[in-house]
């Protein structure tokens, strides 16, 4: 290559300018073909000949050599043409068949490059190594370089974007398709195998069915033999059923203290159907052992199967012990005989009746008579009794023979667990607030009810209509899925467990307008003997009722239909907390209640935060009420309801606020010298938020609680359509009592109510479809009373007036001083949005407790500490004493009735 370079240089020296121009024309051809590097190579050997001063060294060459160079130069002119043809064949410089091109690229790195200028002039350009290398690289493989973009979108969007490689996707799809075809072929083969296996199994099944048919024939022969025995048992059972009522009465006199009767269905009253032999054989084949007693159950009618099952049990075990068990646990079907004392019959063909009821009755203290289906065995019956004792919907009606000699019947619905009861009051004794629950707690209430109480009836789902009836007559309960028809003497408990729908009609009289409800009842504390009655229910506790708003849907709107005290404990916590009332002098409690009281004592003693919150709330409200200077003398006129609930001791009470979270609130060791009242508001709608507004605008929660202790609390209700004028209200009901405050006669509604209670909770209910809730406003004195009454309030109102000098039969009335009255305004409703404070959902400490008390003599801290320390011991002592008394009376009564 070095020799060729020298040869090229020497030949270039002998070039004439004309020949150099021809070479330039060849180089222009290369440049037009974008072969600048080739043009540089072609002009490189001739470059020195471009300059005219260079011919001086050419003369030094010998002439022979000059002729050789001349011939070589002519051959050299043809070289670019040959290279051009090679370049046309190979479009790139990367061809390995072009050694000259490769040599020129790498060998002549420092050679000058010529560039055509205007008018044929040349300019020699000198480039560095880095520039040539970058130029060469860009010419060799420019398509491999991708411009760098600031955003990653440039990789996928634009002219230089990477394609989406559809070929790869197609390849994958073809692969999947081939796999699918392969799988489909395999599935066909598998289906053929399965079909063959199925044929084999069917052949085996035919053999098995033939064997089963032979076995069935054998079983049918055995069943026919047993059927003949059952016929004999039925004949014996027919004789036994004639003596069942006498056995039942004889057995019930011993454990039950004339407060419960069992409705026994006579076999003669219902038609007997023979057992289905095929069903009998099928059950014998399915079951073995003692479970064969339930044969024929599933293929028969409900009531007939109950009777036949009890017949079978009677027939197979003819001992006296079995007769007692069946009598104590006899099946009560839907057909209750009308001759049963204390209850009217539930007819199966009643169009309003959609659920079957089971009648429960109470035994001696400590046990229950649970009437369950007797198609189960004796072992399972024992377990079922244990289960029923723990079930939250099981209710117990307890009553003493001294107070209520008439029997009671409790009827419980299974499906929705609606619990209600029919009660009959004694002719000589006055009725009282009755509620039932398996686990009654240790609280104390004294309530008296005169004999002229009212029975009520809930007849419409949207309207409450109440008709008074003599309380000597027995009561009737008929219910549907969403409508309750209630007739009862004082308080009625309706429990629906899962759907917290409660409809309560209590102590209400019929008003002239259907849309209004007046609550007319009277309780006197003087009748303490007839007032000692526990009032508890598993889900709904109704102690006193104020008013039922108009157009209330009891079940459809999922709200409480009457303004009563309602406690809806959660099902899981129902065994621990609830609103419970008890009087330890009442001998009708059972040992079960005493055990429950002991269990509840631990939770009370362990929770001291509630006491602190209660005392703090009481102190704050007492301080606010004492700062009020508006006081007038008052006279108490006759009122429709006067409740004097007084307790000898500061017994513990658990009040439950039935919001959706089923929150619980405990109030313990109430101050005997102070008054507090609790009003629970039940509404299954978050849109109804009630608020308590003090005179100074202090909020205590939307569901205020009043726990009354010593002073009277006068509550006056106003119908929703009554317009209050300055000093009077026009009402169509002539029976509305009047409340006289000083010299001003104020008529504040169709019903009024004086409440002075120690443990009394009042429930104001609101319906979901009617957002106009009850407003609690005050009927105060002089100018402020007029200003409040001037407002035309369409929503129903309750006026709370606390009277210091009110005749009460209360042992704590000595701390009340006569002569003055303090009025406190409570505003409750949706219109008072500025005072709305939603009820706390979780914390028990934040439950609203509003205590209205203004005794002249404030209780000292020492007295409070003393009451707080002594109340648990007193309760324990009373429990022990009550337990001893109950056991003694139970034994005495059992001995007396056994004779």
Swiss-Prot record:
Interacts (via RBM1 motif) with RPA1. Interacts (via RBM2 motif) with RPA2. Interacts (via the ATR-activation domain motif) with ATR. Keywords: Coiled coil, DNA damage, DNA repair, Isopeptide bond, Nucleus, Phosphoprotein, Ubl conjugation. Residues 71-81, 859-877 have a biased composition (Basic and acidic residues). Pfam families: ETAA1. There is a cross-link at residues 416, 444, 485, 539 (Glycyl lysine isopeptide (Lys-Gly) (interchain with G-Cter in SUMO2)). The keyword Ubl conjugation applies. Residues 180-210 form a coiled coil. Replication stress response protein that accumulates at DNA damage sites and promotes replication fork progression and integrity. Recruited to stalled replication forks via interaction with the RPA complex and directly stimulates ATR kinase activity independently of TOPBP1. Probably only regulates a subset of ATR targets. One of its GO terms (biological process) is regulation of DNA damage checkpoint. It is found in: Nucleus. Phosphorylated by ATR. The RBM1 (RPA1-binding, also named RPA70N-binding) motif mediates interaction with RPA1. The RBM2 (RPA2-binding, also named RPA32C-binding) motif mediates interaction with RPA2. It comes from Bos taurus (Bovine). This is Ewing's tumor-associated antigen 1 homolog. Residues 1-82, 833-899 are annotated as: Disordered. The modification Phosphoserine is found at residues 467, 810. One of its GO terms (molecular function) is protein serine/threonine kinase activator activity. A motif (RBM1 motif) lies at residues 607-622. A motif (ATR-activation domain (AAD)) lies at residues 105-111. A motif (RBM2 motif) lies at residues 868-890. It comes from the Eukaryota. One of its GO terms (cellular component) is nuclear speck.
